[in-house]
Swiss-Prot record:
Top-level taxon: Bacteria
Compartments in which it is found: Cytoplasm
Source organism of this protein record: Synechococcus sp. (strain WH7803)
UniProt KW S-adenosyl-L-methionine keyword: yes
Family membership: Belongs to the methyltransferase superfamily. RNA methyltransferase RsmG family.
InterPro entries hit by this protein: rRNA_ssu_MeTfrase_G, SAM-dependent_MTases_sf
General function of this protein: Specifically methylates the N7 position of a guanine in 16S rRNA.
Name of this protein: Ribosomal RNA small subunit methyltransferase G
EC numbers, comma separated: 2.1.1.-
Length: 254
């Protein structure tokens, strides 16, 4: 049976939770994005979160609430990167909400990146949304990407120390990494802090949100570089997830 709650469609209740309301064009783009995702999902297994609250709360709202400061200056030119974009979230939702931004969306699965690139074209955003099919460890060592971004985003990719190693090398001096997390506790921060020390970065803010309709707690960890990231990071493909910084012994602490 289709959901009939206030959060199952793009109405005022949804936007009041975000503190931001899309203009008519953005609202139409978000509706079109749902239609495109529904269509592509019949051909490529992108996500099960396509209908009703699954889409509007767990995809759109969850993608955008960490960006409340940026939504206040949505037309400001920014370079943003979404690591592990999967079915295009948060990247495509962010591109709609921040019309001044250029987005780079990264995923290692070619069938997913092909679908996401096609959706970006259908949404009329191909001029400012680019898609890369590669492991993010390679992205972070590519001079065209390393140290180039104002915002680096990752949602539901890996543990926080691993995500930090993926994102921090992509930031320029004043850039910020946004680590999308669920519940965040002191022990999570204790795991993250040693990784940030190795990356020459620091936590600058921890923001929390309770998604409506019992969708659970969410946290975003904002991280900034304090110095240029050591060239070692990110390490070779697969190493960050197998040997998370600060959790397992690291031979490069000295």
């Amino acid at each position: 049976m289709p959901e009939s709650t206030p959060f199952a469609a793009p109405g005022p209740e949804l936007w009041s939770r975000l503190g931001w309301t899309p203009d008519a064009g953005q609202r139409e783009q978000l509706i079109t994005l749902q239609e495109l995702l529904r269509d592509w999902n019949t051909r490529v297994n992108l996500t099960r979160l396509v209908e009703g609250e699954d889409f509007w709360v767990t995809q759109v709202l969850d993608s955008l609430w960490p960006l409340k400061p940026e939504l206040d200056t949505a037309d400001t030119p920014r370079r943003c990167i979404d690591v592990g974009t999967g079915g295009g979230f948060p990247g495509l939702a962010v591109a709609i909400a921040l019309p001044g931004a250029e987005l780079t969306l990264v995923d290692s699965v070619s069938r997913k990146t092909a679908a996401v690139a096609a959706m970006a074209r259908s949404l009329g955003m191909a001029d400012r949304v680019s898609v890369r099919t590669e492991r993010v460890e390679r992205t972070g060592q590519d001079p065209r990407c390393r140290g180039q971004f104002d915002l680096a985003l990752a949602r539901a990719v890996a543990s926080a120390p691993v995500v930090a190693e993926y994102l921090v090398p992509l930031l320029h001096t004043n850039g910020q990494a946004l680590l999308y997390r669920g519940r965040w506790q002191q022990e999570d921060q204790r795991d993250l802090d040693p990784a940030l020390a190795l990356l020459k970065a620091k936590t600058v803010a921890i923001e929390r949100c309770e998604l409506p309709s019992a969708r659970g707690p969410r946290t975003v960890i904002r991280v900034m570089p304090e110095q240029p990231t050591p060239h070692l990071y990110p390490r070779a493909v697969g190493i960050p997830s197998k040997q998370p910084l600060g959790i397992q012994a690291d031979d490069n602490r000295s």
